[in-house]
């Protein structure tokens, strides 16, 4: 039998399958990418056992747990765990603290002829390791931050630089009022866990520096871990430049054509387009107080005209109208001001090819 493990680094780097035996509610609050939830107790059973523990102590709670999970219910759960173990012979199981629940699952599997190791310390210890990974990387690793005006292609640059961490990808949000995607953002803990595992892989790869896109503390409603956010605000800034027309086309691609495709893929043609149109209108309305009444009215009318044409014929050209005004009169002045405030941090500026080449040269592994 393989031994239990507390080598969290190897667990996450290897990407082995993990069987989470916590209750569904615990799993929904935060989990690791790819982990499978096959609980020892469902939410109601866990609640009953928890009340019993508080009122009568541990032994009574254990006895109640055995009573609740017995007979066919117990047999079905053991069968599901055994099937997982056979499908993932290199995997591990865990509960919240690596205590009674995972030990019991391990024993029941052993009684059924299946030896399967568990993670010592459970979810709590692994979660602590991931938090420490981000904090340590923020404190000790060199970072570069890619900035630029809206539509300059910062995310495209990240895709070309292997040492980059895609915060917006992990947050499932493009980081502005118009940044919401068709699918909801992951829970905060899931965002942090996936981000930390990504950072761990990048540290293991040996890059001389890591690269992120310029972000505020929040990406949508997801909170960038404080240590990383503070490090980003103090790190060298690489400024990406792009012509205005190219930026308009990139916004059209990502925030109009791409977003419409996401919604249609998720909800179907008619319902998806309606949800996409609603999302754009909501985004415009969200910045109405900062636009002012007259400018908001103009932009909302341009957006409505563009959506009507798109619904009728699929043509997206009219969207350029509101995009151009929004960039020129709203986003560009805002980001120009922010850039001026941080001018001293800019260590390089250039177009996509120049910025990509510079980042590749300054993040390459030692000896490359």
UniProtKB/Swiss-Prot annotation:
EC top class, as a word: transferase
Cross-referenced InterPro entries: Rhodanese-like_dom, Rhodanese-like_dom_sf, SelU
Catalytic activity reported: 5-methylaminomethyl-2-thiouridine(34) in tRNA + selenophosphate + (2E)-geranyl diphosphate + H2O + H(+) = 5-methylaminomethyl-2-selenouridine(34) in tRNA + (2E)-thiogeraniol + phosphate + diphosphate; 5-methylaminomethyl-2-thiouridine(34) in tRNA + (2E)-geranyl diphosphate = 5-methylaminomethyl-S-(2E)-geranyl-thiouridine(34) in tRNA + diphosphate; 5-methylaminomethyl-S-(2E)-geranyl-thiouridine(34) in tRNA + selenophosphate + H(+) = 5-methylaminomethyl-2-(Se-phospho)selenouridine(34) in tRNA + (2E)-thiogeraniol; 5-methylaminomethyl-2-(Se-phospho)selenouridine(34) in tRNA + H2O = 5-methylaminomethyl-2-selenouridine(34) in tRNA + phosphate
Keyword presence, Transferase: yes
Keyword Transferase: yes
GO-annotated molecular function: transferase activity, transferring alkyl or aryl (other than methyl) groups; tRNA 2-selenouridine synthase activity
Keyword terms: Selenium, Transferase
One of the GO BP terms on file: tRNA wobble uridine modification
Active site per database record: 95 (s-selanylcysteine intermediate)
Coiled-coil segments on the chain, per record: none
Taxonomic superkingdom: Bacteria
TM segment ranges: none
Domain Rhodanese: residue ranges: 12-135
EC assignment: 2.9.1.3
Family of this protein: Belongs to the SelU family.
Known function: Involved in the post-transcriptional modification of the uridine at the wobble position (U34) of tRNA(Lys), tRNA(Glu) and tRNA(Gln). Catalyzes the conversion of 2-thiouridine (S2U-RNA) to 2-selenouridine (Se2U-RNA). Acts in a two-step process involving geranylation of 2-thiouridine (S2U) to S-geranyl-2-thiouridine (geS2U) and subsequent selenation of the latter derivative to 2-selenouridine (Se2U) in the tRNA chain.
Subunit annotation: Monomer.
Name assigned to this protein: tRNA 2-selenouridine synthase
Species annotation: Cupriavidus taiwanensis (strain DSM 17343 / BCRC 17206 / CCUG 44338 / CIP 107171 / LMG 19424 / R1)
Gene, per the UniProt record: selU
């Amino acid at each position: 039998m393989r031994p239990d493990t507390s080598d969290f680094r190897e667990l996450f780097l290897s990407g082995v399958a993990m069987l989470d035996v916590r209750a569904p509610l615990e799993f929904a609050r935060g989990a690791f990418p790819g982990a499978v939830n096959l609980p020892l107790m469902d939410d109601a059973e866990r609640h009953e056992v928890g009340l019993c523990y508080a009122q009568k102590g541990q032994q009574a709670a254990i006895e109640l747990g055995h009573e609740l999970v017995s007979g066919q219910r117990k047999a079905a759960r053991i069968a599901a765990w055994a099937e997982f173990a056979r499908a993932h012979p290199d995997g591990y199981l865990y509960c919240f603290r690596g205590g009674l629940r995972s030990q019991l699952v391990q024993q029941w599997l052993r009684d059924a002829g299946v030896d399967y190791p568990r993670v010592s310390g459970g979810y709590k210890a692994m979660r602590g390791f991931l938090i420490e990974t981000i904090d340590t990387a923020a404190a000790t690793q060199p970072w570069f931050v890619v900035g630029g005006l809206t539509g300059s292609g910062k995310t495209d640059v990240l895709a070309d630089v292997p040492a980059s961490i895609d915060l917006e990808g992990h947050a499932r949000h493009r980081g502005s009022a118009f940044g919401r995607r068709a699918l909801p953002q992951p829970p905060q803990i899931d965002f942090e866990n996936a981000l930390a595992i990504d950072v761990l892989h990048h540290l293991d790869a040996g890059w001389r520096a890591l690269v992120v896109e310029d972000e505020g503390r929040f990406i949508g409603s997801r909170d960038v871990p404080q240590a990383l956010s503070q490090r980003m605000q103090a790190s060298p800034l690489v400024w990406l430049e792009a012509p205005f027309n190219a930026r308009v086309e990139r916004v059209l691609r990502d925030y109009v054509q791409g977003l419409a495709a996401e919604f249609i893929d998720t909800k179907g043609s008619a319902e998806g387009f309606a949800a996409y149109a609603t999302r754009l209108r909501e985004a415009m309305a969200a910045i109405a107080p900062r636009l002012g009444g007259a400018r908001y009215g103009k932009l909302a009318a341009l957006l409505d005209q563009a959506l009507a044409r798109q619904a009728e014929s699929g043509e997206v050209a009219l969207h350029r109208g509101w995009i151009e005004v929004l960039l020129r009169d709203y986003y560009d002045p805002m980001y120009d001001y922010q850039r001026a405030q941080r001018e001293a941090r800019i260590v390089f500026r250039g177009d996509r090819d120049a910025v990509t080449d510079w980042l590749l040269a300054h993040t390459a592994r030692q000896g490359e």
